[in-house]
Regions:
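Glycine-rich, acidic and aromatic/proline-enriched surface loops and short helix-turn segments
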Residues: 48, 134, 159-163, 191-192
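Conserved, well-structured core segments
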Residues: 32, 128-131, 158
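Acidic, glycine-rich loop-and-strand cores that form catalytic or ligand-binding grooves
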Residues: 118-133
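Catalytic core of Fe(II)/2-oxoglutarate
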Residues: 140, 148-152, 163-226
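Conserved short histidine dyad/triad with adjacent acidic residue
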Residues: 129-149
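Non-heme Fe(II)/2-oxoglutarate
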Residues: 2-116
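Short beta-strand segments enriched in hydrophobic/aromatic residues
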Residues: 34, 46, 160, 213-215
Length: 226
């Protein structure tokens, strides 16, 4: 297993129709897997929500978090819905981001599970669009799994813009920092082995889409499985 990303592969210019995946310590970086029209869809949805009275919430409002621990603004884009603590047998598909979740549950997860077969078939069905201003960020080391969210197996982050300075997705034990680059996605294990944080952007704001792949034990239209 590679311990570090290949810096040449990580930074080389790619043609419009070229896409690559680089792996290191169970962290996968998908370069150029999302195009301009995909990115604009999220930003247009954020603007539409804002113009129609649906506003993003900061961490203090949503979690009671102190801004020195974590601060950003997020707008949910959940696809699944829960009842009585259990996922319904069919996930709802009447949603703005159907194509995104189908792409995640086919192209993205299949490539990851090809590299790491024991991951199984987790499903991406929820996420959020997140905006981080200079000096803001997720400052504390954390994982994406705990007793309240035991189904989470992988986390993902899609960068919606370039950040010239700062704003890295940083992994503590792996000593890896990933620079935000528009159209790139990172997928990594949700567990304690991959403690991470989102560093403050220094040169301007940072936009991402982030969420999780969960072991739900269901087959549905999202994954094109019967």
């Amino acid at each position: 297993m590679k311990l570090k990303f290949d810096e040449y592969v990580l930074n080389k210019p790619l043609k419009d129709d070229e896409r690559i995946v680089e792996h290191a310590q169970f962290i996968a970086l998908y370069r150029n897997w999302f195009k301009e029209e995909h990115i604009e869809h999220f930003l247009e949805y954020w603007a539409w929500c804002h113009n129609n009275g649906i506003h993003a919430r900061d961490r203090h409002a949503s979690e009671g978090a102190h801004p020195l621990e974590k601060k950003d603004y997020a707008l949910g884009m959940d696809k699944g819905y829960y009842g009585d603590e259990k996922i319904h047998s069919e996930l709802q598909l009447t949603h703005e981001f159907n194509d995104f979740f189908k792409y995640m549950n086919n192209e993205i997860i299949r490539q990851y599970s090809f590299e790491y077969p024991d991951v199984g078939h987790p499903v991406a069905h929820e996420g959020k669009i997140q905006n981080t201003q200079p000096s803001e960020g997720y400052h504390v080391w954390h994982s994406e799994w705990n007793y309240e969210v035991p189904r989470r197996q992988l986390a993902y982050a899609l960068f919606l813009n370039d950040v010239d300075e700062g704003g890295e997705l940083e992994f503590l034990h792996q000593s890896i920092r990933i620079k935000p680059r528009k159209g790139d996605m990172v997928v990594w294990p949700a567990f304690w082995s991959h403690l991470h944080r989102g560093n403050p952007p220094l040169s301007g704001e940072k936009w991402i889409v982030t969420g999780w792949f969960e072991q739900l034990g269901v087959h549905n239209d999202i994954t094109f499985e019967e």
